[in-house]
C-alpha cells in the first residue's frame, strides 16, 4: 500500500511509480457513450513522472484530475507529491471504483472526489496549479474534447497535461494557443504564457500534450 510518509518522492523511480499504479483497478462497467477508455499504469506513470521531474508541475501543487474515472492520474499525482488533488467525474460508478482505489492505496486524505459534469461545474478561474486528464476523444459526443480543454485552460494557473489522438494534434495545439497556452507534444504539456487577469485509446494512437 502507498503511504506518502514512506514514499521518497525525490528518489521515486519510474518503474516504482508504474508498479504502485498497477494496484489501481480499472472501470468495472465502461460507459461507451462517455468514451471511458482506461489509462494504463504505463502511460499514467510516464505522464505524471515527467510532469513532476521535468517540469516541477506536481510536487506540492494543487492538481485537478478532470474526468478522473478510476483516479489513475490523480493517484499518480498523489504518489509524486501533489499537495492536494481533486478528481471530477460524471459517472458515479467510476467514482465508486475511484473511492475504493483511494482506500486501497491509502490516499483518501490527499485526493478528493467530486461527482459533476465538466460542462456545468463551476470552478474559480485559476484555482489549480496543474490539470491532468485523459479526456474523451469526441468520437461519441462531438466537441467533448474541446469542452474538457476549455475547462482545463480556464482553471489552470500554470500547466495542463492532456492525452489526445495524434490526428488532432494541430487542433489541440491551436485550442491551447487561443487560450494563452503554448503546447508541446511530448508524451502533451501546455504552459500558460501570461498570468491570469476495450482499450480503443491505445498509446500508439494517443499522445500526451503538455501546456
Predicted regions and their residues:
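Class I S-adenosyl-L-methionine-dependent methyltransferase catalytic core
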Residues: 2-211
Amino acid at each position: 500500500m502507498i503511504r506518502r510518509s514512506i514514499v521518497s518522492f525525490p528518489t521515486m523511480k519510474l518503474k516504482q511509480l508504474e508498479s504502485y499504479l498497477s494496484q489501481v483497478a480499472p472501470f468495472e462497467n465502461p460507459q461507451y457513450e462517455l468514451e471511458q477508455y482506461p489509462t494504463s499504469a504505463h502511460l499514467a506513470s510516464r505522464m505524471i513522472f515527467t510532469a513532476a521531474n521535468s517540469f516541477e508541475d506536481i510536487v506540492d501543487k494543487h492538481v485537478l484530475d478532470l474526468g478522473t474515472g478510476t483516479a489513475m492520474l490523480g493517484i499518480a499525482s498523489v504518489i509524486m507529491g501533489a499537495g492536494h488533488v481533486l478528481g471530477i467525474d460524471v459517472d458515479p460508478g467510476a467514482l465508486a471504483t475511484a473511492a475504493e482505489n483511494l482506500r486501497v492505496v491509502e490516499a483518501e486524505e490527499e485526493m478528493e472526489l467530486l461527482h459533476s459534469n465538466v460542462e456545468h461545474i463551476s470552478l474559480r478561474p485559476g484555482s489549480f496549479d496543474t490539470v491532468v486528464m485523459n479526456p474523451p476523444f469526441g468520437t461519441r459526443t462531438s466537441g467533448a474534447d474541446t469542452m474538457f480543454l476549455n475547462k482545463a485552460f480556464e482553471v489552470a494557473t500554470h500547466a495542463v497535461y492532456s492525452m489526445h489522438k495524434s490526428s488532432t494534434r494541430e487542433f489541440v495545439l491551436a485550442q491551447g494557443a487561443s487560450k494563452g497556452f503554448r503546447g508541446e507534444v511530448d508524451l502533451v504539456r501546455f504552459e500558460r504564457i501570461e498570468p491570469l487577469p476495450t482499450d480503443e485509446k491505445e498509446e500508439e494512437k494517443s499522445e500526451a500534450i503538455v501546456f
